[in-house]
């Protein structure tokens, strides 16, 4: 829970903000942590976002933010240490003020750029002080988890993700793992190391960007708000319009920040003769090589980095800006023509900082009106702080692009299912020709919306349930696939492609693989035709090659082994077409099921190295899939995602996704849950343990504690399928017990609910009357049990349990244990926190055992 101190609303609340807060789109808000001078998040201000709070340790940098009116209220500028609760409480107080004053229910964006000391996992024991420093990263993670903004952004050095931190659990782990384990249950997260020069920044800057989108924000993925690729710009294009500065100490008359920073005059000879791309160390005249004189002896400077004293190229991308951009002995700081380091203005332009950004509370016009001596005094006082903050900053254009895209996706109206149905009805899109025409001519909707319309139109035409896979769900699944660096050529199969929901995220993930071949298969020729029309709406890179195949993937002879198989196979049992069922079963090891998805699992395991499928959650526990699970558990199950009922809107089915590597032996499995909103990692053998009848993906130490106190596999279960309400009546010879009648070691009488029947002739359930049986309500997480009384029977809402070994003695203590909170929590884990697959069958009855020591 967020703690906050008492807050006080400002006496005068700005009317414009109040009006905006009452608009249909509301305010757009953000918090910035470790914000330095606010150069990066100035881009959010430019896009109309309001800064709720900004936190910076150094007051001189925080002041620069105030010069730019970043926060509406002074209390939003927080100078403090993020490791202290006092600083955090100030942030929470600001959030509370905006919540109460402006009806901001959710913070839109949390930005964090914490100091990070790059360090490999292998070397973490050698540099524990660096791990402590990286605790600031963990503080950022904790703030995201507490505040739960709609989006979060982390920006940092190239080695950020592989650097080590001490996580909230006290263990040292990579920063990427810490982010994933703490935030992966709540957010879809994109991790990317990119050079900002490819994304609109005028200079080279290789950095790590981590963007998270809260999972309850449907149809939006981190890819949707990632900066867009743009052509590189040369240094000449960026700063070539500025006047040349030839005289040391010279300050441009019209721009105080375009200045020739002074240095020791003897150093000018070191760079005056070098050409673009050359270093002072390339001078042939030894007197022009960087040196010092100690006790009359010339000592030449060491050339530790090849980019010291190096003149830059006019017609190449500008170099990376570092904190020591004030000296020639730093990296790539020498102007292409002038004998000086880049001016502040040039560095600003190279970091995409707009002219409107203020470094002082003195207006820019007044600064330019100062006398030369006054200008020099101003720069002497402020220049180093300005240059250092620029060297540490996020380029403004990068955050501005993200802000722009976040604002757009938040303001865009959502295409609801009702809207979709209306479009289909008005345009008569159940007709294939009409649908194709609509897709090809409509420019108002993007791929995701058009595919949703197409999926629902197909479903209405075929009279089937629509299993449209949302783009956020696709991102979750695709993000678990192998990384780009593993491949130079990549072959992907989507065996039941439908309208191709996975294609955009697959293309985005593997855009940097040199060659990507994607085979898409569907049994329905119309689906393939519709997909081809939809693909025209996607920008397909030249490295992506899509082949369309109309076929039944279960019977098709695939000619190659695929690197990745991904998809959402049909979920249905074949009951009428016995010939087709026989063909499917002929190829399958599991002969106990008629469900198509189980056949898909086996077939895809035979043609793919890595297999990722969305399937019904019943896979992990139903008896009919025992053989399928046995086949799968022999290979490495890298990931399991439990979507619960959140996988498909409007379809009441629980689903999971698994990623299975057919080439590898079992190892660790990462489990992500939409139910518990967390991520955890455990040995595969732990969750697929043969001592239990099925997989237990939520198994933990608490579960094991209860399991160790019990004897299992005591009962077999039976449920009646015949006795219906029509067969029963309010009174009669034999009582029919129903789920609400079952109490803790007792029968509960309920007026106008109790039922009876006079005759059991021909009913299979009759064999249990007046036998030693236990009764358990079916479909409940509040288990309770009692012995079945004489002259009673139970309908299908109650499971009838009998002992496998007649000699086993069942006591009231055993049954009473089922009604305890301890067993209820245990049973929830035993049923994998399911909501629909709760029938007590001969697998799940396993967990109703006897106590090893009879004491409640």
Model-derived features with residue positions:
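Core alpha/beta nucleotide-donor-binding catalytic domains of modification enzymes
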Residues: 4-147, 158-162, 166-172, 549, ...
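C-terminal target-recognition/interaction regions appended to catalytic cores
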Residues: 261-421, 729-856
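Non-catalytic DNA-recognition/assembly elements of restriction-modification systems
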Residues: 422-423, 432-434, 446, 492, ...
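Class I S-adenosyl-L-methionine
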Residues: 2-24, 94-107, 117-308, 377-383, 387-408, 412-512, 622-705, 724, ...
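Short, conserved SAM-binding/catalytic segment
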Residues: 66-75, 531-543
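Conserved SAM-binding motif I beta-strand of class I
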Residues: 53-56, 517-522
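Signature of N6-adenine DNA methyltransferases within the class I
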Residues: 176, 180, 190-192, 198-212, ...
């Amino acid at each position: 829970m967020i703690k906050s101190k008492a807050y006080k609303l400002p006496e005068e609340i700005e009317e414009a903000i109040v009006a905006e807060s009452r608009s249909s789109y509301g305010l757009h808000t953000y918090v910035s942590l470790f914000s330095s001078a606010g150069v990066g998040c100035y881009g959010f201000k430019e896009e109309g976002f309001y800064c709720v709070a900004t936190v910076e340790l150094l007051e001189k940098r925080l002041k620069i933010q105030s010069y730019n009116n970043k926060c509406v209220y002074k209390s939003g500028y927080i100078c403090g240490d993020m490791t202290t609760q006092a600083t955090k409480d100030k942030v929470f107080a600001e959030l509370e003020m905006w919540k109460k004053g402006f009806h901001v229910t959710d913070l839109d964006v949390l930005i964090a750029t914490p100091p990070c000391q790059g360090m490999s996992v292998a070397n973490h024991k050698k540099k524990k002080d660096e791990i402590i420093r990286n605790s600031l990263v963990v503080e950022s993670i904790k703030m995201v988890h507490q505040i739960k903004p709609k989006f979060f952004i982390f920006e940092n050095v190239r080695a950020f993700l592989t650097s080590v931190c001490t996580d909230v659990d006290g263990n040292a782990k990579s920063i990427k793992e810490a982010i994933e384990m703490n935030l992966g249950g709540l957010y879809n997260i994109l991790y990317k190391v990119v050079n900002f020069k490819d994304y609109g920044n005028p200079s080279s800057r290789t950095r790590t960007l981590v963007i998270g989108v809260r999972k309850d924000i449907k149809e939006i993925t981190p890819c949707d708000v990632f900066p867009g690729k743009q052509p590189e710009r040369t240094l000449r294009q960026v700063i070539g319009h500025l006047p040349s500065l030839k005289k040391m100490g010279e300050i441009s008359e019209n721009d105080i920040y375009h200045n020739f920073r002074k240095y020791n005059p003897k150093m000018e000879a070191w760079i005056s003769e070098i050409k673009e791309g050359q270093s002072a160390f390339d001078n042939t005249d030894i007197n022009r090589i960087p040196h010092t004189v100690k006790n009359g002896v010339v000592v030449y400077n060491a050339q530790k980095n090849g980019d010291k004293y190096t003149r830059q190229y006019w017609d190449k991308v500008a170099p990376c800006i570092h904190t020591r951009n004030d000296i020639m002995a730093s990296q790539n700081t020498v102007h292409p023509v002038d004998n000086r380091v880049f001016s502040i203005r040039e560095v600003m332009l190279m970091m995409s900082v707009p002219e409107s950004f203020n470094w002082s509370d003195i207006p820019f016009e007044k600064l330019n009106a100062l006398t030369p001596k006054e200008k020099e005094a101003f720069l002497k006082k402020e220049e180093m702080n300005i240059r250092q903050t620029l060297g540490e900053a996020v380029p403004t254009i990068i955050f501005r692009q993200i802000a722009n895209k976040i604002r757009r996706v938040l303001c865009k109206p959502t295409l609801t299912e009702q809207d979709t149905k209306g479009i289909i009805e008005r345009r008569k899109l159940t007709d294939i020709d009409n649908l194709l025409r609509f897709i090809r001519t409509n420019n108002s909707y993007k791929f995701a919306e058009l595919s949703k319309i197409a999926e629902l139109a197909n479903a209405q035409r075929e009279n089937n349930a629509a299993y449209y896979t949302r783009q956020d769900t696709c991102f979750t699944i695709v993000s678990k696939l192998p990384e780009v660096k593993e491949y130079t050529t990549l072959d992907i199969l989507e065996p039941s492609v439908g309208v191709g929901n996975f294609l955009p995220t697959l293309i985005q993930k593997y855009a940097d693989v040199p060659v990507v071949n994607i085979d898409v298969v569907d049994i329905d020729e119309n689906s393939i035709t519709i997909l081809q029309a939809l693909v025209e709406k996607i920008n397909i890179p030249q490295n992506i090659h899509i082949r369309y195949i109309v076929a039944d993937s279960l019977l098709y002879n695939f000619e190659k082994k695929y690197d990745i198989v991904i998809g959402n196979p049909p979920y249905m049992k074949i009951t009428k077409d016995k010939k087709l069922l026989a063909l499917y079963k002929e190829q399958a090891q599991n002969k106990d099921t008629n469900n198509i998805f189980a056949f898909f699992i086996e077939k895809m395991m035979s043609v793919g190295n890595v297999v990722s499928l969305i399937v019904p959650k019943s896979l992990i526990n139903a008896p009919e899939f025992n053989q399928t699970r046995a086949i799968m558990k022999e290979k490495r199950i890298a990931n399991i995602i439990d979507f619960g009922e959140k996988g498909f809107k409007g379809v009441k089915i629980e689903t999971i996704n698994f990623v299975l590597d057919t080439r590898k032996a079992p190892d660790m499995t990462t489990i992500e849950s939409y139910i518990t909103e967390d991520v955890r990692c455990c040995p595969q053998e732990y969750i697929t343990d043969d001592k239990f009848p099925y997989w237990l993906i939520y198994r933990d130490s608490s579960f094991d504690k209860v399991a160790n106190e019990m004897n299992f596999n005591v009962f077999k279960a039976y449920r009646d399928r015949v006795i219906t309400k029509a067969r029963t009546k309010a009174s009669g010879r034999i009582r029919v017990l129903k789920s609400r009648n079952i109490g803790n070691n007792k029968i509960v009488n309920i007026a106008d609910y109790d039922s009876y029947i006079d005759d059991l002739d021909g009913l299979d359930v009759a064999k249990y009357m007046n036998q030693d049986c236990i009764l358990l309500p079916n479909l409940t997480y509040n288990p309770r049990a009692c012995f079945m009384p004489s002259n009673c029977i139970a309908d299908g809402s109650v499971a009838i349990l009998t002992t496998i070994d007649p000699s086993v003695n069942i006591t009231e203590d055993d049954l009473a244990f089922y009604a305890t909170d301890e067993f209820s929590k245990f049973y929830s884990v035993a049923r994998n926190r399911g909501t629909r697959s709760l029938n007590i069958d001969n697998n799940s009855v396993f967990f109703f055992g006897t106590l090893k020591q009879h004491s409640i």
